[in-house]
């Protein structure tokens, strides 16, 4: 099985906003920060607005992969995203090229991210990822149909886990409601 470096199959964009060099614009743009990217591929779309002119390459697109540069433990695959939302400081956008399935690359990166961070941060107080370490990540290149099968399986398993978690939350709400109603009918406060 052959492998390729991530830099050969994807464009890697480090988002670093320098306020001292940033240009201002008259209309605000919408930004996502590190805190918006949560585990289990959850992306909170509570954007912040800024009048800083964003770099075009920081625009988030469907099928992008987002990695936190500092203390990464997971990645976020962008399945859907509203228009004109940008990634803010300390985020990395990986845009996979056409010849490789993006969910497959997301699965590989999600499995390797802790190790990449640990290797990249020897002696550092806070673990982070450097460009050279990320560019050199090897991705096994398998038949495209197998990439689709594995990538979709990975993504759907995350979606299933989110639905199971939500079902447990709803069952807890239902249980608490029933118990509270029962207590009220017995004369409790």
Regions of interest found by a model, annotated:
Residues 1-28, 35-40, 138-189:
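Non-catalytic DNA-recognition/assembly elements of restriction-modification systems
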Residues 6, 92-141, 145:
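Basic, amphipathic alpha-helical recognition segments used for DNA target recognition
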Residues 6-18, 31-40, 58-75, 108-117:
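Short Ser/Thr-interspersed hydrophobic loop/turn segments at strand-loop and sheet-helix junctions
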Residues 22-29, 57-60, 77-89:
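Short, surface-exposed loop/turn microsegments at beta-strand edges and helix-strand junctions
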Residues 49-56:
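Short alpha-helix capping/helix-loop boundary micro-motifs
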Residues 68-108:
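A short beta-sheet element
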